[in-house]
Amino acid sequence: MSKFLSFFRSGFLAVADLLFPRRCVVCGETLLLYEEHFCMHCLAELPLTYFWTYKETGAFVSFYGRVHLESLYSLFYYTESYRRAIHSFKYHSNVRLGYYLAKMLGERIGVSDIDYIIPVPLHYRKKWKRGFNQSEIIAEGIRAGIVAAISKMEQKGVSNDSKENLSTPVVLTKVLGRRKFTGTQTQREKMERWKNVEFAFVLNRRGAKKYNLNGKHILIVDDVVTTGATLDACANILQQNFNCRISIATLACVE
């Protein structure tokens, strides 16, 4: 039965591709049946940061003196060509693409001691207009990637001591809130970005009191890190209220 369903699905996708060809989000070329979101060439050329392999990155160092970070992860550099992937996700409701990239990042973060994943909150007006909070999609994708990495490790066989360290993070969407409508940060200069998010975020005490965040390792996620103003503001609120460790993850990073 499963072979029949697989054959039927492949046939359906083949017909759908003929009627409604899928395009690579970077170059616009028609995708082959086995390709997803990116053509093979553009996927191979994805400008990975490899931040998950070392700590002292330029983006990580830029937070010195502002907030103490455990780690900073970004999947790829926000280049002229590959920013189209972020735009497709955020502004054209390509939620599957955002989840796909986030899961890819989560698999690279791999097994860790992260307890909670907190997405940067979106103002209700912007969420209503867009229909979703992109950071929440990213958070769920990263979690799925980490779970997949844990599953692979368990299949390989690990000791009982190691199993105790296999932590499956929980996504928390009600801990931080956004009380100030700030508009887009895209066209703003560095100092404008900082002023734009000043007092924009607030701790949702009703949501936070359900969880003991003291002593926990929290991963804050967003789509792109540029100056770090938004992520810095969120991290400061958490560290001012809880004795917690903070890491940051984004799909893309401006060089």
Residue positions per predicted region:
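Glycine-rich phosphate/pyrophosphate-handling loop used in enzymes and phosphotransfer proteins
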Residues: 1-255
